[in-house]
């Protein structure tokens, strides 16, 4: 054998030595055969006789026809299928009829029945004869080539080796009908998929490093004989990319090992070696979770085919469903495709479940399949009657593969799924697991109570290091006008927020109050903020996208903000870019029935303009963003923040308050690798997200540290079954307490209200509860039960208790509404209206709609609704007054609080309490009416005199110096701290005759200024 000259000879010797160690045997004497036919026919014939011992009669003829078919087949996809599954051959035997057999080319079960050879510098026929450094054969079929370069050479690098392999694919395309992948061995040890390039296309194929199970770089681990067979059988496929071009799928090391760990969990469970039937694959964006799911589906289907395996690929968004469906349709060489189906309706799901259950009871029915299904098909309401008669499926050979497993996993859909498929195996995939009190990805898919948080982890730093995602650069842009907001600006903000309020001009809040109440998310919705952000984007977009070599995304606070961004970006980009047109920017948002008028008008506008409905437009613009020139900028709110894979996207402008997993998911849209793309750019237009990002990364990295994991385990995770047992015990205790307070059984209460739907009856019961001396204990028990139920996530046993849970929440909502009814006087509720939409008060929406009305008490004194009304009035008044600081309000508040205690303790007669309550409410109503006509100085004087009389026992009629100073203060636009110091001095003088003791007078003066005057004027 001719050897390469020094120094390359050392590289080649190293390769030969390692191949020999792995059980590959050097091939000699077949150069001519390989040169003409690409395969080594004598070896193949001999091996096929050995591995096809299932064929009896006509074996030689079957084998001859199979070899001829293999040699003459022009399509690499078909040849890969032959290599994976064998070749089906049919012989026509005249009167005997047709005889069929599948001729195996490789024995995947019995590795030693195959022969593994390597050849050094073997020539292959092509337009130019090519000579790979090494060719690896299995049973005479060329499967792998190795191209070697000197490790320490400026000229001979791995890039040169890759270019050489690409040239081979063009010059000897038929060889690559058989060769499945190539190894690059030089300054880097890499592997790439290979396939013919007869069209001589300019291809971009990313080379990968291989790491062994310990995550140590080791290309020889990939070339182990068992690894090669496993990879070919279960992990290599042909497909088409989104542009319709042929491509070849080959596993990356983290995909392979994650799938193998998940498969080990599956086999141990099905072979009764372990009770564990779930697992979490925690892999960051760009690691290829879609194909991890498809690999595992194929592996499970292939290995358990004789047990009628069932696979449910579950997603929770239409975009993901479409993506998976398209990817599976494009996939070739996957055996599971023979029985793949997308479940389009709840009725179809019922049919599939019924077929599976019937196959359990009837051995003559074979039911296997791979199903793509939306989580929302497991709808308790739509499946209620079905489930009552159907029950559960006992079959264990059911695999649930759940993408984006951090979402939709603690509610009714997951609970119902787990109830029906009670013995199924569930493997969850996510880049951002969630751990909150009511939802924990770790608890749903792992065994944290046993120290297992995941089967496999591949997070951000590993992804960037391996080149599967790019580094992210953050640019923080802090709006200047928020640095030192003035009182006038506060006034303007209030006018915008409450423009439709009748009393908007009377809403006066201090700088401190507005800072506490108005959140960043509210400010990010303001038109002025969006306008300024759009101006900034227009000024930087060309630089940030490299003159639109790449594309951009704008993430807005809400859907209305998206439309405003479109308006202002069009305006400012038109000024900056000469050839700009409005198709460069498009809004991709969700539209709902009865949308706000601005969104509805925009919807009508674009549907008319483009002649398509908004769903079609969203789909078109999303696809065009990836594959076409326009749009160049997508404007989004929630859509596309997760699961959107667009390597062309480089820059994301974030004008939304994001944190935790959603921030990580959103930022990951920018760092997908693309040709000549060095990094992803995040422009933080809020000024604070970078700290949120760092915190989220730190939180996730906690789960890598074994010591911290142990601490987390001890402090945060409790076995779900124990939580459930606690829930059941405490539910029984709660029911006994309910009966003690209300006088009826809890279950009877539910039955009666379901029949009557009587809100008055409900209010009576709520009032009894509120006015009971056991109320605090009752309410604590109620909240604890709700929290325990939510804490068990998608635990299957929950399903039978959902109605109980709903009624617990209704009671809680009823108590909250009766104790804290909404008041038009508190404008901050409007600021938080988006939050209020999510409160679950649908069932009894009209229960607590009472306003303060003393006359109502007079009219109802002798009616049985009195308990309800007293409870309403007391708690409404207390809630309304509790944040009021003026002495008049405080005095009324304290008196009503005394009446509440007297009413509950029964130390005063009902009539006395009611009469006193009427007096308080009348006084409150009178002062509220009077307050509307008072200036700030008049309001301050009235409250000071009230305080001095009722608290300090000073019967003083006038405070002349103080009053004059306050009136002057009222005309000032800017109030300084020194102004309040001046008031203290004048008040100290005014009180000279009323409070003789100097120190006490100073304290009273200071207290009045701090607690009465300042809150009114600031």
From Swiss-Prot:
EC class: hydrolase
InterPro entries: Helicase_ATP-bd, HsdR_RecA-like_helicase_dom_2, P-loop_NTPase, Restrct_endonuc_type1_HsdR_N, Restrct_endonuc_typeI_HsdR, SWI2_SNF2, Type-I_R_enzyme_R_subunit
Residue ranges crossing the lipid bilayer per the database entry: none
Entry keyword set: ATP-binding, DNA-binding, Endonuclease, Helicase, Hydrolase, Nuclease, Nucleotide-binding, Restriction system
CDD domains given in the database record: DEXHc_RE_I_HsdR, HsdR_N
A molecular function (GO) term: ATP binding
Function: The restriction (R) subunit of a type I restriction enzyme that recognizes 5'-GAYN(5)GTAA-3' and cleaves a random distance away. The R subunit is required for both endonuclease and ATPase activities but not for modification. After locating a non-methylated recognition site, the enzyme complex serves as a molecular motor that translocates DNA in an ATP-dependent manner until a collision occurs that triggers cleavage.
Stated name of the protein: Putative type I restriction enzyme MjaVIIIP endonuclease subunit
Record lineage: Archaea, Methanobacteriati, Methanobacteriota, Methanomada group, Methanococci
């Amino acid at each position: 054998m001719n050897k390469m000259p020094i120094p390359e000879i050392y590289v080649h010797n190293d390769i030969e030595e390692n191949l020999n160690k792995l059980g590959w045997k050097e091939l000699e004497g077949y150069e001519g055969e390989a040169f003409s036919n690409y395969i080594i026919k004598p070896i193949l014939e001999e091996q096929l006789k050995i591995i096809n011992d299932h064929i009896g009669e006509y074996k030689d003829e079957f084998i001859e026809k199979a070899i001829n078919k293999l040699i003459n087949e022009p399509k690499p996809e078909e040849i890969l299928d032959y290599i994976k599954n064998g070749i089906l051959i049919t012989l026509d035997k005249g009167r005997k009829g047709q005889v069929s057999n599948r001729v195996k080319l490789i024995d995947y079960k019995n590795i030693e029945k195959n022969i593994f050879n390597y050849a050094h510098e073997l020539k292959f026929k092509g337009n130019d004869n090519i000579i790979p450094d090494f060719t690896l054969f299995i049973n005479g079929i060329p499967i792998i080539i190795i191209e070697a370069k000197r490790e320490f050479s400026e000229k001979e690098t791995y890039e040169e080796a890759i270019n050489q392999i690409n040239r081979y694919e063009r010059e000897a395309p038929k060889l690559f009908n058989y060769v499945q992948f190539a190894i690059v061995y030089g300054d880097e040890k890499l592997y790439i998929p290979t396939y013919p390039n007869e069209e001589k296309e300019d291809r971009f194929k990313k080379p990968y490093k291989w790491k062994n199970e310990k995550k140590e770089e080791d290309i020889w681990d990939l070339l182990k004989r068992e690894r090669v067979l496993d990879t070919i059988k279960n992990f290599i496929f042909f497909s088409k990319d989104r542009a319709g071009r042929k491509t070849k799928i080959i596993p990356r090391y983290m995909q392979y090992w994650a799938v193998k760990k998940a498969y080990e969990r599956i086999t141990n469970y099905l072979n009764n070696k372990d009770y564990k039937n779930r697992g979490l694959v925690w892999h960051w964006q760009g690691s290829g979770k879609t194909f991890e799911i498809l690999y595992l589906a194929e592996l499970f289907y292939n290995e358990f085919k004789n047990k009628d395996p069932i696979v449910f690929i579950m997603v929770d968004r239409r975009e993901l469903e479409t993506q998976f469906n398209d990817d599976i349709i494009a996939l070739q060489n996957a055996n599971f495709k023979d029985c793949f189906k997308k479940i389009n309706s709840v009725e179809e799901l019922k049919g599939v479940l019924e077929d599976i259950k019937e196959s359990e009871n009837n051995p003559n029915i074979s039911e296997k399949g791979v199903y793509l299904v939306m989580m929302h098909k497991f709808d308790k309401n739509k499946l209620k009657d079905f489930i009552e008669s159907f029950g559960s499926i006992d079959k264990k050979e059911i695999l649930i593969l759940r993408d984006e497993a951090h979402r939709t996993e603690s509610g009714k859909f997951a609970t119902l799924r787990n109830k029906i498929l009670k013995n199924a195996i569930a493997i969850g995939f996510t880049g951002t697991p969630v751990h909150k009190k009511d939802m924990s990805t770790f608890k749903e898919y792992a065994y944290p109570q046993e120290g297992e948080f995941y089967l496999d982890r591949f997070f951000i730093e590993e992804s960037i290091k391996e080149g599967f995602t790019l580094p992210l650069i953050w640019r923080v842009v802090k709006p200047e006008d928020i640095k030192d907001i003035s009182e006038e600006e506060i006034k303007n903000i209030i006018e915008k927020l409450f423009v439709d309020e009748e009393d908007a001009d009377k809403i006066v809040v201090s700088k401190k109050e507005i800072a506490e109440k108005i959140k960043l998310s509210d400010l990010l919705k303001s038109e002025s903020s969006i306008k300024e952000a759009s101006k900034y984007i227009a000024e930087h977009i060309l630089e940030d996208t490299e003159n639109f070599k790449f594309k951009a995304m704008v993430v807005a606070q809400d859907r209305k903000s998206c439309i405003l961004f479109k308006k202002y970006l069009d305006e400012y980009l038109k000024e900056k870019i000469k050839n700009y047109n409005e198709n460069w920017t498009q809004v991709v948002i969700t539209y709902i029935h009865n949308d706000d008028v601005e969104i509805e008008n925009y919807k009508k506008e674009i549907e008319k303009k483009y002649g398509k409905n908004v769903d079609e437009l969203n789909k078109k613009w999303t696809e065009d963003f990836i594959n076409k020139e326009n749009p160049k900028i997508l404007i989004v709110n929630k859509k596309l923040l997760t699961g959107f894979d667009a390597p062309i996207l480089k820059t994301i402008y974030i004008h939304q308050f994001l944190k935790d997993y959603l921030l990580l998911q959103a930022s990951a849209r920018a760092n997908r690798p693309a040709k000549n793309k060095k990094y992803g750019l995040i422009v933080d237009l809020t000024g604070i997200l970078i700290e949120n990002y760092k915190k989220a990364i730190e939180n996730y990295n906690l789960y890598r540290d074994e010591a911290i994991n142990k601490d987390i385990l001890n402090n945060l995770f409790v076995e779900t079954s124990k939580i459930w047992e606690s829930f059941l015990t405490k539910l029984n205790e709660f029911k006994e307490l309910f009966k003690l307070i209300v006088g009826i059984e809890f279950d009877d209460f539910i039955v009666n209200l379901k029949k009557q739907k009587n809100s008055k009856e409900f209010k009576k019961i709520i009032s009894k509860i509120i006015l009971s001396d056991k109320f605090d204990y009752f309410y604590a028990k109620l909240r604890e039960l709700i929290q325990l139920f939510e804490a068990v996530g998608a635990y299957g046993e929950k399903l039978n208790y959902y109605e109980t849970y709903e009624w617990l929440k209704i009671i809680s909502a009823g108590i909250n509404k009766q104790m804290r009814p909404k008041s038009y006087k508190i404008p901050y509720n409007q600021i938080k209206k988006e939050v209020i939409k999510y409160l679950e008060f649908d069932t009894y929406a009209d229960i607590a709609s009472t306003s303060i009305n003393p006359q109502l008490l007079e009219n109802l004194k002798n009616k049985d609704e009195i308990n309800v009304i007293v409870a309403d009035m007391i708690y409404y008044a207390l809630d309304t007054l509790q944040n009021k600081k003026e002495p008049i309000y405080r005095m009324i508040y304290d008196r009503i609080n005394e009446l509440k205690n007297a009413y509950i303790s029964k130390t005063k007669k009902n009539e006395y309490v009611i009469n006193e309550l009427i007096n308080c409410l009348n006084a409150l109503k009178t002062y509220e009416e009077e307050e509307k006509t008072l200036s700030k100085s008049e309001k301050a004087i009235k409250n000071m005199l009230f305080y001095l009389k009722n608290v300090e026992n000073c019967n003083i009629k006038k405070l002349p110096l103080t009053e004059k100073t306050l009136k002057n203060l009222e005309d000032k636009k800017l109030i300084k701290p020194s102004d309040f110091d001046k008031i203290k001095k004048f008040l100290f003088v005014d009180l000279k005759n009323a409070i003789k003791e100097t120190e006490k007078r100073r304290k009273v003066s200071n207290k009045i200024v701090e607690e009465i005057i300042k809150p009114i004027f600031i």
